[in-house]
Amino acid sequence: AKLAQALGAASTAPALQAAQRPERPRGKLNAPKVCKAVGHLLPENAILIDEAITSGLMLNVMTQGAPRHDLITLTGGAIGQGLPNAVGAAVACPDRPVIALIGDGTAMYTIQALWTMAREGLNVTAIIFNNASYSVLNVELERVGAEEAGPKAKSQLDLHGPVLHFAQLAQGMGVHAVRTDEAEGFCKALEYALAHP
């Protein structure tokens, strides 16, 4: 209140955003549409785990009008905590749905958490974005002034060879999994996952 008075803003009403869910996405699937679908379908009291890195940039915008939920995010400087965070959240709060948004590179650090989810029957829906790259590390190379990485460095940040098939990896660990390239298929799969913990 004192700061608002000092700035001459004491009588200014705060700008409040309407609590409105985004529309159901349609068409070819991309990262913002995944975040939009999560915002559209997010159940009340859910726990969101965000380690989608560059793929999850729109998550906060798309879920701000969703029902009340908790968000656990990456603190920076390391990757690989998202799937284990989802396990921990599901164990700590078995009555709440957990939705984990995970990048493909970070998933590879702790992919075995999927097996734990299946073994323990945890209420976790894991969404793995597959852009076949450690995209955030390419950004970090630029931030530290490595203007043009050489072919060896670039190859270390590429996840194309061999191609990762996350749905097959998950199925091999006992997790029901699907892969989709269409927003409609993604929404249908997310609805199914939330209805069948």
Where are these regions (language model features)?
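Glycine-rich, acidic loop regions that bind phosphate or pyrophosphate groups
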Residues: 1-16, 190-194
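A general, composition-driven signal for non-globular sequence regions
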Residues: 11-18, 114, 136-137
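Generic hydrophobic, helix-prone segments enriched in Leu/Val/Ile
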Residues: 2-7, 19-24, 140-141, 157
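Thiamine diphosphate
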Residues: 1, 57-197
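Alpha-helix initiation and N-capping motif
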Residues: 12-13, 35, 121, 163
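Internal, well-ordered alpha-helical segments in soluble enzyme and binding-protein domains
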Residues: 2-3, 30, 34, 182
